[in-house]
């Protein structure tokens, strides 16, 4: 309650709203099209709705990388659930969704976030996906390439190319599985 009162008292002095807490306030529910609010997150966001500023939430806890745009008509809210620097504890290099063990670096210019980048301990090019040949073949005997995408966002455009040519969507299949490395 004291923290909520502090937010109410200090809201007139802010130019950018970044809320950092341990557990995610919102998450994608695999069976739903919108995130499920947790606890009293909406009550806290209501403190800032008259500011007309975008709200950024930083969270962790789940050992996954996830970005959620919170569906509110009165304000713009994005929550970034960060992967964990220790991975999934028992398997250091990776988190539960296959995201690398990492921390996230944010760059600011004034009140604007100019860049968000994962800093991991393996491949610096491995920002949002890992591509590898799983050794499997399809029904026609052609090799199958597996791709794990983490921290995806519904506004992203996903395009797969083979030797420079776009692969038809009919040849792509989305699956919810653990990363092969995990």
Q: What are these language model-derived features?
A:
Residues 26-27, 88, 167:
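Flexible, glycine-rich phosphate/dinucleotide-binding loops
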Residues 62-67, 101-105:
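Substrate-binding cleft of secreted/luminal carbohydrate-active enzymes
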Residues 30, 125-127, 171:
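Outer-membrane beta-barrel proteins
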Residues 12-59, 67-72:
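Active-site-proximal segments of metal-dependent phosphoesterases and phosphodiesterases across multiple
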Residues 72, 76-163:
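Binuclear metal-dependent phosphoesterase catalytic core
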Residues 166-182:
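Solvent-exposed serine/threonine-rich low-complexity stretches and specific carbohydrate-binding patches
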Residues 1, 18-22, 77-83:
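Active-site-proximal beta-strand elements of phosphoester/diester hydrolases
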Residues 3-8:
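Short, small-residue-biased leader/transition segments that mark boundaries at the very start
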């Amino acid at each position: 309650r004291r923290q909520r009162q502090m937010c109410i008292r200090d809201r007139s002095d802010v130019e950018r709203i970044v809320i950092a807490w341990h557990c995610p306030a919102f998450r994608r529910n695999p069976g739903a099209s919108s995130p499920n609010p947790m606890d009293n997150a909406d009550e806290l966001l209501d403190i800032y709705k008259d500011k007309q500023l975008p709200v950024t939430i930083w969270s962790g806890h789940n050992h996954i990388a996830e970005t959620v745009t919170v569906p509110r008509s009165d304000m713009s809210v994005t929550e970034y659930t960060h992967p964990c620097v220790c991975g999934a504890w028992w398997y250091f290099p990776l988190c539960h969704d296959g995201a690398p063990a990492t921390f996230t670096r944010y760059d600011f210019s004034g009140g604007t976030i100019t860049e968000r980048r994962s800093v991991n301990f393996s491949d610096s090019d491995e920002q949002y996906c890992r591509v590898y040949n799983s050794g499997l073949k399809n029904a026609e005997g052609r090799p199958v390439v597996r791709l794990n995408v983490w921290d995806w966002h519904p506004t992203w455009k996903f395009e797969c190319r083979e030797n420079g040519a776009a692969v038809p969507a009919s040849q792509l299949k989305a699956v919810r599985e653990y990363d092969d490395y995990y």
